[in-house]
């Protein structure tokens, strides 16, 4: 029997909306998960099940790092309104092999949604074929680690820094982006600094918008959000409103 698609987001409304969108087009069992304990349990008991995560990796580095033993060896799809270079890069650092990204615009469009799910199902099937040598039942849950959340972020940032050069940035662009992401200017003139910043961001697939510099070059402690769903009160209010979850998400 094939294992189900697991859907999870730290926001209950996002989880239910993703479920409403994907159930009609996935054509296989779908399991909606609403808290970290439940997510860990399903990842452990269904080691080959594909996972849809309604989040951006750069905002959940610590939790994803600790979940890495359970996320590795399966297809993972990240869904959000937008992504940054950090988001596209971090799954590789986390040791994920089959992963993808999908915007809400894609999810909202029926044609692109079906196309994305076909692609994702094929990716999941490829993973399951390649994973025959691994006994998923023996895969362990994330162990409590002595490494702190700050140390995890530091490790991620050291890796991201090295990846800037691998992405094609020259030494000046790497230096300028690193300094400016810390709010520093360095000794270059304003015009030269702006030039290297813009060309560096362009090589990373981002525009010169300041938000890309803030979120897209390194991971930050102040942007980290724990993977915990809101309390049952917000969930109850949505049900009592009588509105469809997908409708609310559009508001």
Located regions from the model:
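N-terminal regulatory/sensing modules of transcriptional regulators
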Residues: 1-144
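Solvent-exposed, well-ordered amphipathic alpha-helical segments
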Residues: 2-6, 24, 43-51, 74, ...
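Charged/polar, solvent-exposed surface patches and flexible loops
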Residues: 20, 24, 41, 69, ...
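Generic structural signal of hydrophobic/aromatic residues within well-ordered alpha-helices
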Residues: 39, 156, 160, 210-217
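Phosphate/pyrophosphate-recognition segments in soluble nucleotide-handling domains
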Residues: 132-141, 146-162, 223-237
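Helix-turn-helix DNA-binding segment
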Residues: 146-198, 202-204
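Basic, Lys/Arg-enriched C-terminal extension of HTH/homeodomain DNA-binding domains
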Residues: 198-251
């Amino acid at each position: 029997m094939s294992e189900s698609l697991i859907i999870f987001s730290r926001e209950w409304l996002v989880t239910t909306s993703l479920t409403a969108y994907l159930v009609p087009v996935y054509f296989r069992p779908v399991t909606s998960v609403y808290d970290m304990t439940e997510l860990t349990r399903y990842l452990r008991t269904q080691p080959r099940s594909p996972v849809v995560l309604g989040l951006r990796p750069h905002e959940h580095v610590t939790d994803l790092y600790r979940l890495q033993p359970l996320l590795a060896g399966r297809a993972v799809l990240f869904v959000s309104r937008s992504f940054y270079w950090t988001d596209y890069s971090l799954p590789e650092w986390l040791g994920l092999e089959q992963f993808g990204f999908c915007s809400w615009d894609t999810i909202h469009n029926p044609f692109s949604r079906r196309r994305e799910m076909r692609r994702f199902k094929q990716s999941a099937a490829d993973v399951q074929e390649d994973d025959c040598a691994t006994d998923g039942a023996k895969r362990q849950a994330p162990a409590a680690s002595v490494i702190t959340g700050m140390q995890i972020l530091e490790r991620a940032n050291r890796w991201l820094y090295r990846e800037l050069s691998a992405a094609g940035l020259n030494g000046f662009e790497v230096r300028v982006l690193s300094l400016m992401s810390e709010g520093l200017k360095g000794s270059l003139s304003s015009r030269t600094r702006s030039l290297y910043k813009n060309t560096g961001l362009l090589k990373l697939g981002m525009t010169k918008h300041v938000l890309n510099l803030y979120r897209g070059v390194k991971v930050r402690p102040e942007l980290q959000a724990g993977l915990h769903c809101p309390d049952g009160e917000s969930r109850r209010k949505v049900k009592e409103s009588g509105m469809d979850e997908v409708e609310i998400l559009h508001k």
